[in-house]
Amino acid sequence: MKTAKDVLKSIKDNDVKYVDLRFTDPRGKWQHVTFDVSMIDEDIFAEGTMFDGSSIAGWKAINESDMCLMPDPVTATIDPFFAETTMVITCDVLEPTTGEPYNRDPRGIAKKAEAMVKSMGVGDTVFVGPEAEFFVFDDVRFSSSPYNTGFRLDSSELPTNTDTEYEGGNLGHRVRTKGGYFPVPPQDSVQDMRSEMLGAMAKMGVKVEKHHHEVASAQHELGMKFDTLTLMADHLQIYKYCIHQVAHIYGKTATFMPKPVYGDNGSGMHVHQSIWKDGKPVFAGNKYADLSETCLHYIGGIIKHAKAINAFTNPSTNSYKRLVPGYEAPVLLAYSARNRSASCRIPYTASPKAKRVEVRFPDPLANPYLGFAAMLMAGLDGIKNKIDPGPAMDKDLYDLPKEELKQIPTVCGSLREALENLDKDRAFLKAGGVFDDDFIDSYIELKMTEVERFEMTPHPVEFDMYYSG
C-alpha cells in the first residue's frame, strides 16, 4: 500500500511537474483541480486542501461552500495523456469544520458500505467486477433548442454506410445490426484503438484482462480484473477516462449512454460481486448452483430492493430505453445459473473461489461508488433478514408465455419510477449510516430535474407520429 512518503518519492523519481486531484460528483462525473508540484507535501495528505463545493450539482449551497479534498495516496498514478508529467490522485471529500467524510461524497459512501460488511460480521472483503460497454462514433451532432431538437450519429462501421461514398472508395466489411459479437478485422474496425485504451488503463494502475467488439455496430467492451469495492469504483472512473481520451485522440467520440441507437443492443454494465471472510468465499456452499444460503439471501435482497437500486444503477432517462425486452436486457427480477436472461445470474465455475453473483441490469452511466454501494446494501439487507429469493428460473425467460411473465417482477420502467421507489424504500440504504436522508433527498431532487426536463421536451418521434394528425 502506498503512503504519502511513497507518493512524494514517486513525484521526485518521475520528475512530476503537476499533481491532479480528482473526485467524483453525485452524477458520477470525474472532476479535477491541478496543482503545481511545489504545492504538494506531506501536509496535504494530512490536512487536505480546500475547494469550492457550491459549483458541484447536488452539493453545498453558496453560503456554505467550503469543502476539503483529502488525497488518498493509494490511488496515485501517472496520467499518460497530459503533455507535462502529471500525477493523478483520487480524493475523498471531507467537511472542513469536523474533518469527517462529507455525507454526499460518493466515494465516502462506498467506503462506509464496505465497512458495513465487517461490522455485520458477514465478511471482511467485498470484490466487485463490472463489465461496462460503450459506443464509439466518428461523429455526433445534437441540438436541444426549442426550435431545433434532434441528433445524428455516424460511424464507418454502421450498416447504414454500405453505400456511402468515401475518399478512396467504400471497402464494405460493415458490422450488421446485432452482428458485432465478434468478427475479426476489417469488420472490427477499431482493434488498435481498443488496445491503446487497455494499455492506457494499465499505465494508470488498472489490472486489465482483454477487449473485444460488442453486439451492436460501433459497440465495445474492455475487461478488467475484479478488485475491492471502492478501488474498483476508482478503476471504473479510470476506465471511462481512458476510453474518452483515446477515442478523442483518434478523432472519434465515445459514449456510455445505455441506448444511443434505436433498434440495436444497448450498453449495459453487468456487475459481478462476492464477499470473502478469513480468506474463504462466503458465497460458496451446497445449495442451488453450489451457492451458500448466505448468497441466496444476498440475491433475495437484490431482487427485493431492485426498483430502489435502479435509481443508482440506472440513473438516466436513457437507461430505461435499454431496459426493454428483446435486446438481451435483463428486465425480469429472477435468478439463474448460466441463464443470461435473468437479472441475477450465477456464472458457471468449478472453483468455489469463483462463486459470485452477476447483477445484469446496471448500466455504465451509473456512478460506480453509489451503484456498487446500493447493491451491496441491498444484499446485506437480504442476509440480515434472511430474504428468500424464491425458486431459480432456469428456462429462457425471454420465451415464457405472457401469463407466466406477468408473475415475475420487473425492474423499473422509467427514472421517475426508480426515484419514487428510492423515496419509498430507503431504510436498507440507511443501515449503519451508509446513506442518509439528506443525501437521498438531494439525489432525488437532482435527478428529478433531469426527469422533468425530459418529460417536458417535445420529441422528434412525436412529430413523426402526430404532426399531421
Curated annotation (Swiss-Prot):
TM ranges: none
Record-level Gene Ontology MF annotations: ATP binding; glutamine synthetase activity; metal ion binding
Cofactor: binding comment: Binds 2 Mg(2+) ions per subunit.
Domain GS beta-grasp: 14-98
Main subcellular location: cytoplasm
Pfam families according to UniProt: Gln-synt_C (PF00120), Gln-synt_N (PF03951)
Catalytic activity line of the entry: L-glutamate + NH4(+) + ATP = L-glutamine + ADP + phosphate + H(+)
GS catalytic domain sequence ranges: 106-469
The protein's Enzyme Commission number: 6.3.1.2
Subcellular location: Cytoplasm
Documented activity regulation: The activity of this enzyme could be controlled by adenylation under conditions of abundant glutamine.
Chain sites annotated for binding Mg(2+) 2: 133, 214, 221
Chain positions recorded as L-glutamate binding sites: 265-266, 322, 328, 340, 360
Extra facts: Two forms of glutamine synthetase (GSI and GSII) can be found in this nitrogen fixing bacteria, GSI is a typical prokaryotic glutamine synthetase whereas GSII is similar to the eukaryotic enzyme.
Name of the protein in its database record: Glutamine synthetase
Gene: glnA
